[in-house]
Amino acid sequence: MDRLDYYIEKQYGNDPKWFEEEIIQGSHAQRISNVIANRDYLSGRHKVLLRQDSQYKGKTLVVNKTVINYAKTVIKFHNTFLLGHPTALSCNDEHTLNTFNDIYKLGQYATVDYEIIDRVNKFGDAYEVVYIDNGVIKSKVLDSACSYPVYDELGEYLAFIEHWTDVFTSITYWNVYYPTYVEHWSNEGADEHLVSTTMAIGLPIHYHNFSDEDYNYGVSMLTDIKPILDELEDIMSKLGDAIYVNTLNPLPVAVGQRIESSIPADATG
């Protein structure tokens, strides 16, 4: 019995649909949640946008919400710093070198390399599937929010699950990667069933940077950047409120006036 069979037997009692339980484990849920949160942040949905507007005498005072998209610039700088120049391969055997250069060009691996480093910087992890299409070696970088690598308690990489739900049809799909083959599952027609099985040349390649919390996974650059930018956005927003409300457009308040409701914490002035 190999380690994967032992893992499935020990954790899931040899259930052929073991992958359904694997993807809802707490460690996976937390990691996917972080990926989605980082994706939302890079899309412009920042914490500062949650600042509440304040009310005064039946009128709404719209508080300032300053968004700084500097995180994108930082990540792009790191991507360009590492892959700003074309990758150059070297080998003592000229024939081997030419072969690998042809593979690199035909498979458009310059783009693949950039996608990998970009997702590692954004999400901490990236996953590459290598396959052959009409005799050409190619690679596909998987969506980090749909990727579930399977490790055992010793940190050995055993399997990989790609899972997503189509937003238009609400059909859920699972691509379960084993070392030598891939099972394609779907719940189209209400019940989960095996659609097809294809050959594979190995598990998806898992790229990640180093993390002191978990050696099997990486950590996003945004983990360190977001708290700083959130604080900066909050300060600049409140500073803008203080300038426009206190200096340019002050609100008159009578001393001793009865306040019938609490003042929002985000109100400045």
Where would I find each of the regions flagged by the language model?
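Intrinsic disorder/low-complexity segments enriched in polar/small residues
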Residues: K10, E21-I23, R31, H184, ...
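Residue-level detector of alpha-helical transmembrane segments in integral membrane proteins
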Residues: I8-E9, N79, L142, T197, ...
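Charged, low-complexity, helix/coiled-coil-prone segments
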Residues: L42-K47, Q55-K65, T172, D234-P252
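Extended, helix-rich architectural segments
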Residues: M1-I137
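Extended, regular secondary-structure scaffolds
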Residues: I117-G218
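Extended, charged amphipathic alpha-helical segments
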Residues: V195-G269
